[in-house]
Amino acid sequence: MRIPRFYFPDALTLGARVALPKDAAHHAVRVLRMGEGDAVSLFNGDNHAYSARILRIEKQNIVVLIESRVALSCESTLSILLVQGISSGERMDYTLQKAVELGVAAIQPIQAERSVVKLAGERREKRMQHWQNVVTAACEQCGRNKVPEVKPVSGLMDWLGEQGSEGQRILLVPDAEMRLRELAQPVGAVTLAVGPEGGFSDKEQTALLHYGFTSVRLGPRVLRTETAALAALASMQALWGDY
């Protein structure tokens, strides 16, 4: 039986007794029906896996004992920042979840001109927390011990103005002349920009190209935004990463 994995947001030390976060405790008790003495695995983003055992269960509170620690990194040799135009509802969640499984290092949500979902104020903060929870849950499932950051939502021009010039920069465009596999092996990190439903506007594409992005296509077919991002990530891992 696969040992359940849970994210723990604070430092962990051998021999420590810690209470699982509320959501993790609820899942362990109500969904997995775990009991005292059962084994769990914890991670907190430091590229280690911590083996623990349940000491006691009190209603929704679970206390575990940290028994061992092992260095375990599942991070790709290729560092990819996904710059994703915000798509609607489940599409964005799906993109983030699968991007984590495909080894993305971080995600930058962009409030693009054609984004159907418009976020501001408290709604934006809640959505960002939701996205970070999606990413954390994906790490629990896929075995990553380092949690990719979901960066604060930004407009495209604001984000571009804050960036340097280092690394390979790739923009997915359905009618681009160059194909992804025709690009040279990147030196250092890669930034991948993918538009929302309908893609980036002409103005946004022009700005991205001005800031050093190279437009590429993925085959002769038009892909949905969630398909495009994931197909590109998988292709880059196969070409330059750990596939």
Task: Provide a role label for each language-model segment.
Residues Q163-Q205, F213-V216:
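Active-site/ligand-binding-proximal alpha/beta "capping" segment
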Residues A11, R69, Q111-S115, P220-R221:
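Short, ordered loop/turn segments at secondary-structure junctions
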Residues S73-I170:
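RNA substrate-binding interface of SAM-dependent RNA methyltransferases
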Residues M1-A71:
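N-terminal positively charged helical leader segments and presequences
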Residues D202-Y243:
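Structured adenosyl-cofactor binding patch, chiefly the S-adenosyl-L-methionine
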Residues V40, V64, V147-K151, S215:
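Generic structural signal for residues in well-ordered beta-strands
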